[in-house]
Amino acid sequence: MARRPRPDGPQHLLALVRSAVPPVHPAGRPFIAAGLAIAAVGHRYRWLRGTGLLAAAACAGFFRHPQRVPPTRPAAIVAPADGVICAIDSAAPPAELSMGDTPLPRVSIFLSILDAHVQRAPVSGEVIAVQHRPGRFGSADLPEASDDNERTSVRIRMPNGAEVVAVQIAGLVARRIVCDAHVGDKLAIGDTYGLIRFGSRLDTYLPAGAEPIVNVGQRAVAGETVLAECR
């Protein structure tokens, strides 16, 4: 009779580490490598070695890509980002998407530098538009950030025909928006599609008639917190 593998040793330790430490988004690897390189080059100098290791650890935490379990309800619209809900209002979607000027329900999430900064699809559907618009790099927690700051908008059409727009907005420190979504892509709810480096904001425009079920000041978990349900 074959023996069962022992629950110890290097492989078991590696499995425990993988289960406890979130993986890193590919966009963060160059930053982590730079920190490790500084530590290696300056290994004879404690302050330089420590600075490099600290920078690498900080970047690993910032670019973490934790696993998430989206809800199974087909009508759910989930948060596209971790952070604090800073505004719930109505506004016309970004003009570059050519969706008209009729106000739609909007939920805004502010991401601090301590939040995970990967973005996830708020719904399942097809990407029908991706538009980038240059702009300012003002503080992302201010109301005018939605209109003035640099942004990338992703428009997703659900199987029932309803549309949801997720807008990545650069901030005072975050000056690099990464969007991996392209027109024609089929996304499942909770799929990772982008990242904003070092602090930012996410605006989610809901279908007309959808009512947000979250509150200002509430913490949102990307891919899991339900913002609203599509009627």
Curated annotation (Swiss-Prot):
It is a peripheral membrane protein. It is an enzyme of class 4 (lyase). Keywords: Cell membrane, Decarboxylase, Lipid biosynthesis, Lipid metabolism, Lyase, Membrane, Phospholipid biosynthesis, Phospholipid metabolism, Pyruvate, Zymogen. It comes from the Bacteria. It catalyses: a 1,2-diacyl-sn-glycero-3-phospho-L-serine + H(+) = a 1,2-diacyl-sn-glycero-3-phosphoethanolamine + CO2. The record marks 199-200 as: Cleavage (non-hydrolytic). It is found in: Cell membrane. Its cofactor is pyruvate. Belongs to the phosphatidylserine decarboxylase family. PSD-A subfamily. Heterodimer of a large membrane-associated beta subunit and a small pyruvoyl-containing alpha subunit. Catalyzes the formation of phosphatidylethanolamine (PtdEtn) from phosphatidylserine (PtdSer). This is Phosphatidylserine decarboxylase proenzyme. It comes from Mycobacterium tuberculosis (strain ATCC 25177 / H37Ra). The gene is psd.
